[in-house]
């Protein structure tokens, strides 16, 4: 199962805000620094960790200060996923899921800047929303995600 997330850049705080697709009017967004992921896997996340954030349908690791175990970037327009992502990101995410050390924070930050910000900077897109697919995680979902149309622009 996967939870679909909207991603919006908050330029005032220089963070990416994540929230479930179709739930823009419910709950509050989950924010985190673009380069805040540590170089190694975080400890196990308790089942109730982050439940107060009202982000239904997300794995519990999504609420970890270290970020989710696996974050698969997908753009509905160019269909870029971890399958064809540069710098062996799928292997990195798989290692992180297994609790092994991964690439440096700088490497992860560079990847997201390349993928997430390239269209905005080079193509001049004003709508700074992208869609993320969060899945492939060893943690259980908090609850089943609400059905939504992946290709509906947020």
Swiss-Prot record:
UniProt keyword Phosphoprotein present: no
Mitochondrial targeting sequence: annotated span: 68-117
Q: What is this protein called?
A: Protein X
Q: Which Pfam families match?
A: X
As recorded in Swiss-Prot or TrEMBL, the protein's gene is named: X
Q: What's this protein's function?
A: Multifunctional protein that plays a role in silencing host antiviral defenses and promoting viral transcription. Does not seem to be essential for HBV infection. May be directly involved in development of cirrhosis and liver cancer (hepatocellular carcinoma). Most of cytosolic activities involve modulation of cytosolic calcium. The effect on apoptosis is controversial depending on the cell types in which the studies have been conducted. May induce apoptosis by localizing in mitochondria and causing loss of mitochondrial membrane potential.
Species this chain originates from:
Orangutan hepatitis B virus (isolate Somad) (HBVoru)
Q: How is the protein altered post-translationally, as described in the entry?
A: A fraction may be phosphorylated in insect cells and HepG2 cells, a human hepatoblastoma cell line. Phosphorylated in vitro by host protein kinase C or mitogen-activated protein kinase. N-acetylated in insect cells.
- Indicate the family of this protein: Belongs to the orthohepadnavirus protein X family.
